[in-house]
């Protein structure tokens, strides 16, 4: 008898009833991924293992990916179990081995993990990333952000849409089917079926802030009030989505500058990391939000998160005090009379140096079109990079080396950015 059949025979009447109840709860989430290419972020813990078997029950297509951090002896067994499950149920299993992180382990591990998932999504054309975050996880995040001082934009974590800033790459959707399911229900699900899973011993260490919140507050609250907490988080999510839908950004992509950066970074694997290089200026018209400072701050939150960064309470205060005219981390935040602009300072991040100083004509153009001074060096760098690419592509064309050709080149570039700063 195949192992898959043996798994199905572990059901009894109460198991089947419980599976039906949990399946009913998850049906809306699963309906959207029946015909898609799905990658499951797997850890061999109770959450992702329960999701693995729930996906099997509902005949959802998926493969799995796991990261080996080499921080615990048990991790070898966890990776081996992932491979065993994949082989048993005819799934692909991808494994990444993380380097040693000297500091900020959680942040660096998360970044490495998502880079790994991203590379697989690009290479194998997955459209959805399935994550096993459950209700307790969501409450942990909310309470930790609440104690730091956070607005609606950051209380609920990252959005479910991941945008790649490389046009050649596809965007993908993150699905969290278990987000309204209490963790104790997942323990029950696995226990009643005799499903093996692993417990990460580091989760017991209360010196980690997340673990402290988990054991002192979150688990107790979810065990007592899970239904109400799930509803509240759902309402907050809808409220945030409605607000963020109002905050649609106009964008100006600095494509030539990005190409120059990519040429300079020879030691970075293109499919794994270029999605992080954001050479885009984001903008919103103040009248769109009635010049409401809170909504403009929410816009800043939204753009920062699209770039993989969470603004702190202190940073939000600094943006407000500066009247949206400051630099936060690698973000340039500036404005003119009509608009707010946000861009990553890619020149500083990647040590880009322009070969020629700003021309007088370019300075006049910027002044007449109300281009904020903090953005002018980015636009000039884009022009210099674009000019270099054009001259390289048309090296034999005479018009590019005479005054008339250069004038045509410059006029074409200005036309590209004209409407962005005047409308």
Swiss-Prot record:
Belongs to the tRNA(Ile)-lysidine synthase family. Disulfide bonds: none annotated. It comes from the Bacteria. The N-terminal region contains the highly conserved SGGXDS motif, predicted to be a P-loop motif involved in ATP binding. Keywords: ATP-binding, Cytoplasm, Ligase, Nucleotide-binding, tRNA processing. The keyword Ribosomal protein does not apply. GO terms for molecular function: ATP binding; tRNA(Ile)-lysidine synthase activity. The lineage of its organism: Bacteria, Pseudomonadati, Campylobacterota, Epsilonproteobacteria, Campylobacterales. It comes from Helicobacter hepaticus (strain ATCC 51449 / 3B1). HAMAP family: tRNA_Ile_lys_synt. The keyword Transmembrane helix does not apply. It catalyses: cytidine(34) in tRNA(Ile2) + L-lysine + ATP = lysidine(34) in tRNA(Ile2) + AMP + diphosphate + H(+). Its EC number is 6.3.4.19. ATP binds at residues 43-48. GO terms for cellular component: cytoplasm. It is an enzyme of class 6 (ligase). NCBIfam families: lysidine_TilS_N. The gene is tilS. Ligates lysine onto the cytidine present at position 34 of the AUA codon-specific tRNA(Ile) that contains the anticodon CAU, in an ATP-dependent manner. Cytidine is converted to lysidine, thus changing the amino acid specificity of the tRNA from methionine to isoleucine. InterPro entries: Rossmann-like_a/b/a_fold, TilS/TtcA_N, tRNA_Ile_lys_synt, tRNA_Ile_lys_synt_N. It is found in: Cytoplasm. This is tRNA(Ile)-lysidine synthase. One of its GO terms (biological process) is tRNA modification.
């Amino acid at each position: 008898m195949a192992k898959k059949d043996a798994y199905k025979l572990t059901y009894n009447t109460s198991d089947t009833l419980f599976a039906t109840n949990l399946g009913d709860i998850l049906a809306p989430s699963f309906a959207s991924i029946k015909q898609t290419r799905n990658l499951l972020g797997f850890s061999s813990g109770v959450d992702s293992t329960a999701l693995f078997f729930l996906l099997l029950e509902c005949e959802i297509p998926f493969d799995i990916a796991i990261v080996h951090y080499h921080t615990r002896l048990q991790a070898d067994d966890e990776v081996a179990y992932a491979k065993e499950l994949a082989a048993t149920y005819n799934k692909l299993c991808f494994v990444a081995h993380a380097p040693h992180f000297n500091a900020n382990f959680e942040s660096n591990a998360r970044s490495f993990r998502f880079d790994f998932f991203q590379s697989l999504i690009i290479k194998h054309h997955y459209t959805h990333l399935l994550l096993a975050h459950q209700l307790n996880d969501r409450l942990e995040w909310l309470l930790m952000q609440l104690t730091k001082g956070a607005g609606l934009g950051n209380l609920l974590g990252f959005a479910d849409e991941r945008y790649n800033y490389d046009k050649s790459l596809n965007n993908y959707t993150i699905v969290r089917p278990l987000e309204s399911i209490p963790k104790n229900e997942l323990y029950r699900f696995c226990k009643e079926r005799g499903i093996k899973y692993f417990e990460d011993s580091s989760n017991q260490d209360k010196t980690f802030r997340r673990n402290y919140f988990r054991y002192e507050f979150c688990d107790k609250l979810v065990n007592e009030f899970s239904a109400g907490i799930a509803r509240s988080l759902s309402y907050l999510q809808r409220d945030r989505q409605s607000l963020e839908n109002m905050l649609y950004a106009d964008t100006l992509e600095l494509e030539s500058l990005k190409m120059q950066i990519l040429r300079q970074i020879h030691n970075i694997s293109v499919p794994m990391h270029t999605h992080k290089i954001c050479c885009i200026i984001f903008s919103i018209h103040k009248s769109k939000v009635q010049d409401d400072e809170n909504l403009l701050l929410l816009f800043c939150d939204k753009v920062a998160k699209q770039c993989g960064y969470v603004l702190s309470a202190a940073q939000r205060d600094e943006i407000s005090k500066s009247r949206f005219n400051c630099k936060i981390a690698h973000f340039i935040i500036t404005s003119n009379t009509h608009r707010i602009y946000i861009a990553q300072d890619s020149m500083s991040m990647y040590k880009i140096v322009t070969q020629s100083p700003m021309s007088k004509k370019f300075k006049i153009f910027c002044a007449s079109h109300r281009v904020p001074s903090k953005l002018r060096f980015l636009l000039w760098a884009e022009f210099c990079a674009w000019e270099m690419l054009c001259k390289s592509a048309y090296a034999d064309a005479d018009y590019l080396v005479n005054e008339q050709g250069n004038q045509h080149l410059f006029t074409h570039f200005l036309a590209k950015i004209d409407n962005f700063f005047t409308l």
